A protein has these predicted regions:
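Active-site-proximal region of nucleotide-activated glycan assembly enzymes
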Residues: 2-61
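Short loop/helix-cap segments at secondary-structure boundaries that form the rim of catalytic
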Residues: 1, 37, 50-59, 72-76, ...
Length: 221
């Protein structure tokens, strides 16, 4: 028996709503998603919300699998913005915004190699090498979170009640981000528009149904 588990299997669900993307791109996305599950007896599709089973596709929709450290963390509403840059090139956008808003504290994680664990630009802007424990600690104490819209960290932010700015860089992330917005995660932008994130942090209300759904993972999987 082979069971496959991933968020992208939701793209094969007939009720999944896609953003207005190029039709050919969506066909390709679904094709490659199917290819990853050839021979699977069951596809567990990680989702922001409860959805029906699809026996014809062998799809069972399940909650996101969050790390134990996230589930055990007590969030507080801090005064800094937290972020994760999949591509360290985005750091220039962060620096430019910081010059205009020098008094907003920023703790940004990146994948940049050959730099110190913390690159402290000044007392309000720090770039951190990715470190799971530190990342969760900063997430728990942040005002809000900015990311390139990977599924896992968006779920972590939602669980901890943090509004999210998502900047997708490819079609899979665009679909994730669109779905996350429907689930109340936050907003999507084509750049790291931290003004939008600050504004969102003033009005955002966490989605209690999401936390309840996450807590069902143990007995649904």
């Amino acid at each position: 028996l082979m069971v496959c588990i991933a968020h992208q299997y939701l793209f094969l669900h007939p009720d999944f709503v896609f953003p207005g993307q190029n039709r050919l791109s969506l066909v390709s996305l679904k094709f490659f998603t199917r290819m990853t599950a050839i021979g699977a007896t069951k596809k567990l599709a990680l989702s922001f919300r409860k959805m029906r089973e699809v026996p014809s596709e062998r799809i069972v929709v399940v909650p996101p699998l969050l790390r134990k450290e996230v589930l055990e963390t007590t969030p507080v509403n801090g005064d800094y913005l937290h972020g994760y840059l999949l591509n360290s090139g985005f750091s220039e956008e962060i620096r430019s915004w910081h010059k205009v808003h020098p008094n907003v504290a920023l703790h940004i994680f990146w994948d940049k190699k050959e730099v110190r664990p913390e690159v402290k630009v000044d007392s309000f802007l720090s770039f951190h090498q990715l470190n799971d424990t530190l990342f969760i600690r900063y997430m728990a104490g942040a005002k809000a979170y900015a990311t390139t819209a990977g599924f896992e960290s968006v779920c972590e932010a939602m669980y901890l009640g943090k509004p999210v700015l998502m900047v997708p860089t490819h079609i899979e992330q665009s679909c994730n981000a669109f779905d996350a917005v429907q689930a109340g995660a936050g907003v999507v932008a084509d750049r790291f528009d931290l003004d939008a994130l600050l504004e969102l942090s003033r009005t955002h209300r966490p989605n209690p149904a999401f936390s309840h759904w996450v807590k069902q993972a143990d007995w649904l999987i």
